[in-house]
Amino acid sequence: MTRKYGILSIVGLLFAGPALAQGKAEKGKEYFLLCQTCHGENGAGNKDLNAPRIAGQHGWYLQRQLQNFKAGVRGAHADDLYGQLMAPMAQTLPDDQAVLDVVAYVQSLK
């Protein structure tokens, strides 16, 4: 029985790897200065710009969306007008750590 729990613990840690990655909210605040232009100072969003509320959103979701915008998975289709606005904004984040940092900051907003 103990061996079974040990194996399950190891498997759990293997899949938790990306979730264990941490961003630095204080650094993310610097990146967020550009984000707040559309999403607002507190991440509440802006209906006029079709910028959704991001405060209170799950970190994994924010991370995935930013990575998809950076990679061109989102915002590349001609009909995705708002995505085309967001894609170059995500491109300003220089690397994966910057994505984690801005996500950490957004998660600090309530």
Give a label for each model feature.
Residues 16-18:
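N-terminal signal peptide c-region/cleavage motif recognized by signal peptidases
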Residues 29-33, 56-59, 63:
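Sequence context surrounding c-type heme c attachment/ligation sites in exported
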